């Protein structure tokens, strides 16, 4: 079964949470599978910070015949978030007001703005119910935000390695990365490659938070004792910076890191705990044991305060990045979650079991 790419155009003014507006926007989105007659067999994916709508590049194991979400049975969709650089409106897009790229003039956006655009796409596709909403890290923040904003839309949510409000620790890591971008003398230029050397340094800083002590010890050890320079860990960091710089831009990285910082579901809703009570979906909250950036205490908080939630914790050498690496663990956790629901339903003799591969 082949994936398909699409563009959603919204031609009306979009009012943003911070008070600014966008004179319309577009979202690139990727789909796999077909909508059923009831249009409710939908699995919607929210991608992470530097991700795209092409979930087959990073989560295909979950969306395969042997995975928990078989595309012959589900309609799977992922949209590149507003502010992104993979086909959706972002800082390198043309501002229709002046015919030039936005660059530094792209407005401040929040996760609340992003899920508003997702919801407009959902309405355009005439999808009234989403069976499963899943995402990790920044995408997991959007899962929580959207489930609060539109509680009647979602049946199940799976927020992974994420939180209800971004922590001072996480904000500090992001600010260190933005300082690296700002230190690049080209950053203030209006050019698509502005700040690109700073972006490389920012990515290297970020990698320290995405991984952990044991990750580097196991994957980047020195094989000799006589080296004085060009250590494997150092060259690995440079490699990661170069790799991101070849596919991303500093404007988007800066913008989306600010968006992550502003994540707080309690804003204008009384409190974080009050906001979480608004969620009606049954939740599978997944944490990663050695996650430095989103420690498991944050997922425990979510599970404790969402009305109907189960917490599962993965183990991974790769820390926060484990949600992009530990496919077998994640697959089994998701399958077992739905298997238990199916068994509970059978025990009550109310309706047929869910269509999940065991």
Model-derived regions: residue spans:
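Catalytic active-site module of serine/aspartate enzymes centered on a nucleophile-bearing elbow/loop
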Residues: 300-301, 308-358
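Alpha/beta-hydrolase-fold enzymes
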Residues: 153-155, 159-243
